[in-house]
UniProtKB/Swiss-Prot annotation:
One of its GO terms (biological process) is translation. Part of the ribosomal stalk of the 50S ribosomal subunit. The N-terminus interacts with L11 and the large rRNA to form the base of the stalk. The C-terminus forms an elongated spine to which L12 dimers bind in a sequential fashion forming a multimeric L10(L12)X complex. The keyword Ribonucleoprotein applies. The gene is rplJ. One of its GO terms (molecular function) is large ribosomal subunit rRNA binding. One of its GO terms (cellular component) is large ribosomal subunit. NCBIfam families: PRK00099.1-1. This is Large ribosomal subunit protein uL10. SUPFAM superfamilies: Ribosomal protein L10-like. It comes from the Bacteria. Keywords: Ribonucleoprotein, Ribosomal protein, RNA-binding, rRNA-binding. Belongs to the universal ribosomal protein uL10 family. CDD domains: Ribosomal_L10 (cd05797). The lineage of its organism: Bacteria, Pseudomonadati, Spirochaetota, Spirochaetia, Spirochaetales.
């Protein structure tokens, strides 16, 4: 038979409400185990994550379970052992995952347990694969480079045709079809 407290402690209720509010503001969550990290290492990790507007919060598993349940999410498998959650917007989740895995290479005590990215549950291996993908800015720049390269090649071909014509060489443009 479970023993129940006679009354709820206001400090604990406030802590759960604060955590619920923070979880509600974020769209993605990356769960980590921080056992063995020093205060200096946690501070350095938080500083690196701040670049991505990420809040890295050490949570009590019971409080986090209550908060996630109130948000209609079940994450019990990630709330085992000392848990810290990186709260981040989906736009920056890739960069945060990359920072966490890079930090885990330097400090093996940090373990990424899994994530919920925009409502989809990822295990640790999927989060690691996700962290290796290029971010949104990199993808946009790669796309624009490809567009620019095609345009530059087209302009160079046109310029070569103009140069040949100026030299007096007759230029004929042949289509890819049959010329017979």
């Amino acid at each position: 038979m479970a023993v129940r407290a006679r009354r709820l402690q206001p400090a604990k209720v406030a802590a759960v409400e604060s955590l619920t509010r923070d979880l509600g503001e974020a769209s993605s969550y990356i769960f980590t185990e921080y056992r063995g990290l020093t205060v200096e290492q946690l501070t350095a990790l938080r500083r690196a994550l701040r670049e991505f507007s990420c809040v890295y919060r050490v949570v009590r598993n019971n409080f986090a379970n209550i908060a996630f349940t109130s948000l209609n999410m079940t994450v019990g498998e990630y709330l085992v052992g000392p848990t810290a959650i990186a709260l981040v917007d989906t736009e920056h989740a890739n960069g945060v995952a990359r920072v966490l895995f890079d930090f885990a290479k330097e400090v093996p005590a940090l373990v990424v347990k899994g994530a919920i990215l925009d409502g989809e549950v990822f295990d640790a291996s999927k989060v690691e694969a996700y962290s290796k993908l290029p971010g949104k800015k990199e993808l946009v720049s790669m796309f624009l480079s490809a567009l620019n390269a095609t345009t530059v090649k087209f302009v160079r071909v046109l310029q070569a045709v103009m140069d040949k014509r100026d030299e007096g060489v007759e230029v004929s443009v042949v289509s890819g079809g049959d010329s017979s």
